[in-house]
Amino acid sequence: MAGEKDFSGLEEKLGVKFINPDYLIQALVHRSYLNEHPDFRLGHNERLEFLGDAVVELIVTEYLYNNYPNPEGDLTNWRAALVNAVMLSAVCKDMGVEEYLYLSRGESKDVGTKARQYILANAFEAIVGAIYLDRGYDVVK
């Protein structure tokens, strides 16, 4: 269950100590995990991912807008180059997020696959959503 994992290392890498650690835990729960653990006390991360996607887009858009006078087309292309599954999953890999994920046995075996890349990218967005809910926009930025 949730108590089996120590998230302090991940919180340190994120630079955030969660007020409500359930947000972080839920951000790491893939839908497949709940198929094998139907009594798990939290839901999967898809709603947090939905929220986090919007927050990531806003943060990157705001940064580009405030720091580059380029036309809209350039800014849109740069944002697309920064906010995609390849980049977001790479950030998660660098932070060691994989070791904290709650995955089904089948998903746990698919290391290094395209599917894992999307799981990590989605986890990144869910973590951002969790930080946003727990600590607000200024902290998540």
Stretch-by-stretch model annotation:
Residues 2-141:
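RNase III-family endoribonuclease catalytic core
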